[in-house]
Amino acid sequence: MESFSLRQNYFPRSSHDTAEVFPAPDSLSERERFHQLQQELVHQYERIFPDMTAEKTIVIIPSLTIDQELLTRVSGSVHYEERMLSLLMLLRMPRTHVVYVTSVPIEPVIVDYYLHLLPGITGNHARQRLTMLSCFDGSTKSLSEKILERPRLMERIRSSIPMHEMAHITAFNTTKFERTLSVRLNLPLFGCDPDLLFHGSKSGSRRIFKDCGINLPKGFEDLRDENDIIDALVALKTEDRNLQKAVVKVIKTLAYHKSLLEPLH
């Protein structure tokens, strides 16, 4: 695989240039390109992140990329994107730029509130280094998908990054859509490779603990449906007749729906 330098190939051609060819989403070529970009993140993490005076840009994509049907159950889910406004505190570094992208525009008074919390930096100075962009789309589709559907918006994100500055994407969570966005914007992603996400899941973590011989609560992983759950609970009760309760963990859901305490009578 040929070597790749983000600094040498920083700005790709316009999104509207039909001669520009991107790897197919979720393809091997896209994965290879993504891994090349991630090597640049190593350099940024070691050299640029600790330097408070370095010129850098953080592109914040607060995309809640989870099942759309699940999001429809949450009133005002689009406002979850405001939770990463705390990252505007990065503007306390005087040569740092932030590009913040949302589904719908955030009220200026909310942004001003955060900017006035900055220590030692005036709100006006920080605002000059902040670019707020929006898809103007309040649907339950994830923000990352919305951006990918809008080549002009991606071009605006690119043009908001000062020439020759180091930059990376920070996202709420990482999936194949954030990986594709990373490749399309030619920016490394400050997050886990989506192909490795399973190892940090509840089932994946239990597997790792077992493989390493680490003690962990008795239980089962990789359960797929209601019958699997019933079989697992029966097996636990059969093994320990004194067992009174078991916790059923749900992998892909919102924070307040992750666990169910099941009595075993």
Residue ranges and their predicted role:
Residues 193-265:
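Active-site nucleotide/adenylate-binding loops and adjacent lid/helix of ATP-dependent enzymes
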Residues 2-207:
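ATP-binding N-terminal substructure of ATP-dependent carboxylate-amine bond-forming enzymes
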